[in-house]
Amino acid sequence: MKKLIFLSLMAICFCVRLYAQTNFKYKNASLPVEVRVQDLLSRMTLEEKIAQMRHIHAYSIMENGKLNEEKLEKMIGGQNYGFIEGITLPGKECLTLMNEVQKYMREKTRLGIPVFTLTESLHGSVHDGSTIFPQAIALGSTFNPILAYEMTSAIAKELSAQGITQSLTPVIDVCRDLRWGRVEECFGEDPFLVSRMGVSQVRGYLDNQVSPMIKHFGAHGTPQGGLNLASVSCGQRELLSIYLKTFETVVKEAKPWAVMSSYNSWNNEPNSSSHYLMTELLRDRWDFQGYVYSDWGAIGMLNYFHKTAQNSAEAAIQALTAGLDAEASDNSYAELQQLVENGMLDVKYIDQAVARILTAKFNMGLFEYPLPMEKNYDKVVHAPAHVSLARKIAEESIVLLQNENNILPLQMNKLKSIAVIGPNADQVQFGDYTWSRDNKDGVTLLEALKERVGNQLTLNYAKGCDLVTDDRSGFKEAVDVAKKSDVCIVVVGSASASLARDYSNATCGEGFDLSDLTLTGVQEDLVEAIHATGKPVIVVLLSGKPFAMSWIKENIPGIVVQWYPGEQGG
């Protein structure tokens, strides 16, 4: 009897405790976000708070393509980590993993705080099978903010179907050194254009329940020498009116919940430890209410690259006290607990950072977020409407630079043959931050022309040369092809890597800066050789950045810039 009474009392206590936990204020969606944040923050241990400021790489908790719960438990030690990324995962694998991790965080940790599942989606989700839209520089060339909104609305739907709640885009840098490899990621060199496109893209994400992260804050688009990690040198007036004007506009008008700090510096002061940028400007002057996230490894760079910190602990102090709330792909914030316990860091900075992260999670509905179902995946990812939108953007992004004697459009009924020549004539170029570089995942210009002309006329193709080598052995074939054709289309340009997959022969994109702006390899020599045949020539620039083509401008009657046009580019 006593045993029965004891068990009954234990059951009652458990039920009372469970009822109390499920009725915590932070779990009540009807309460103001501020109340929910403060209630949850008051219940968190120091370890739990710091975990919210850190992230997990998917590959570190997976085995044979699936979640290894033992690895996850060992890594997080029962704490709710704030973020997880799975950038290189195939789409359905990403959905499965993100759902499993999200469910684990909600159901098997003490407070059940959901995780921000994040990925890249600069011009489409980077997970296999997603729609590949035109690169940002192409979208900017449409001068159409409506298309910018429609594009991120479509991307957000695909991300949600893949279990993603936080996108590491859009890029709203103002690019003014065209040697920089990341020009392709930007909308352009005008702050007004970049601002309008940025506002539209942020709204497209937010209206479709995905949190965007504007980047790279701040002054990242004009590094010295065009080198990706180099400092940006400019006065405060130029900084505010050019490079940061886009961030001010987007923060005030579109109200994103996340900003990524860049890993470079302004006038040799690292952005990752700039109190002026992240606190005085972003929060005090512009009233930003969300959190600041570091670029990949940027906090550690304060130690080994910028040399402002002697070790990772100093780097953590510099970044956090300046206003950098969350750390990506580094372990500097693992030092925070010991720094607090040793009296070297006031815990108020941690509370402040965690409150901002939780504010974003509550506002984005993560605590009430239903896990996406796999049955919806194929209906959403690479949907026909998204593919059609990608084509529409590609069409509007084309720029006609030169059209002497109205050589364009071609009078197809007057032609018997067309020569299609060049290293990019039969090769897709999607741009950086994509999941593929393979022709099977897009339409090349040559393929599209074959479909367009059918049996109406003859297409003669020759590659001519590569993008980067000095090999001219293909010139003879290209010249022969040109001689037997009525008109020649020569497709030159650049190539970019696909994110974390294939970096071969890249001449553009992150980490692939150029020392000058002439076409790489012997591409211009190829154009000259084709021009020497006396046949009419049209040059198509299929690239992620502008190039200096003085000879081509002076001698070729038709010049078209296509940029990186996405999967429907042909």
Residue map of PLM features:
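Bacterial Sec-dependent N-terminal signal peptides
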Residues: 1-23
